[in-house]
Amino acid sequence: MSYVKKDLISTKDLSKDDIFSILSLAKDYKALNLEPVKKDPILKGVTVVNAFFENSTRTRTSFEIAAKRLGADAINFSSSTSSTNKGETLIDTIHNIEAMKTDIFIVRHYSSGAAKFVTKNTPSCVVNAGDGCNEHPTQALLDLLTIYEAKGSFSGLSVTIIGDIFHSRVARSNIYAMQTLGIKVKLFGPPMFMQNAEVFGCHICKDMDEAVMGSDAIIMLRIQLERSDGEVAFPSIREYSKYFGLTKTRMQKAKDDVIILHPGPINRGVEINSDVADDARFSSILDQVENGVAIRMAVLKTIYQNKFKA
């Protein structure tokens, strides 16, 4: 494997070779996951803790399945039933769980930079499972695997990310990784969710038609009102769908072989209509979910083995 760190916090830390190494291992694990016995006990005896301080369905379940298929003991930790509700700090929580001889922390937290902060306070391996508006590296990797499987190469590809760019950790991790791979990235969304988007160095589209046309893959994002603190003047759902939603009519302007991705959860009838999200000709959304397990198996194996290479 090319990647040499014991933590995965940002796709900025991944070289082109790192990305391809992880994707290659993930493809092997995807094949294993089709077998009757879906096990590679490379992490037998290893304790993996899903330390989630935000709600999650796909990511937490995916990491738990990934850890168990590698033979690890996977423990789910939820802040809603923990001593954080009594005032315990993030680091005190990590140190207490670490005292139980935890080997890998999967950290999801509402504060940007939380995962990086944890790495500075524990010798255990750490994977960023989403920190505030900052990053979500394994989501970007599973998106890349999904795109690669559909297109066979990253060469010459154009990918559009549409929606709440400002609050999206998925957008950031994808942008950084795609730029490393030489993929052209276009962005589009309501002005209030495109603040400072020019800093990414991507093409900013002027309307939905431009965003859709010529793209090999389109990543739709939901509006994250929970991160706006009530400061965003959100249009009505009908108005949002009219100007920024992906509909069958808009798909007529897309390439015939375009694929549609969405990190979930989907708000049907808002950023994407059901007849697009469920259309097998375009939708790769469930492929993303399947690929998430394989990617996270690859990441867990890689970082844990790296811990002993230093």
Curated annotation (Swiss-Prot):
Gene3D superfamilies: Aspartate/ornithine carbamoyltransferase (3.40.50.1370). Pathway: Pyrimidine metabolism; UMP biosynthesis via de novo pathway; (S)-dihydroorotate from bicarbonate: step 2/3. Carbamoyl phosphate binds at residues 58-59, 108, 136, 139, 264-265. Pfam families: OTCace (PF00185), OTCace_N (PF02729). Its EC number is 2.1.3.2. One of its GO terms (cellular component) is cytosol. One of its GO terms (biological process) is 'de novo' pyrimidine nucleobase biosynthetic process. L-aspartate binds at residues 86, 169, 222. Catalyzes the condensation of carbamoyl phosphate and aspartate to form carbamoyl aspartate and inorganic phosphate, the committed step in the de novo pyrimidine nucleotide biosynthesis pathway. PANTHER family: ASPARTATE CARBAMOYLTRANSFERASE, ORNITHINE CARBAMOYLTRANSFERASE, MITOCHONDRIAL. Heterododecamer (2C3:3R2) of six catalytic PyrB chains organized as two trimers (C3), and six regulatory PyrI chains organized as three dimers (R2). Belongs to the aspartate/ornithine carbamoyltransferase superfamily. ATCase family. This is Aspartate carbamoyltransferase catalytic subunit. The gene is pyrB.
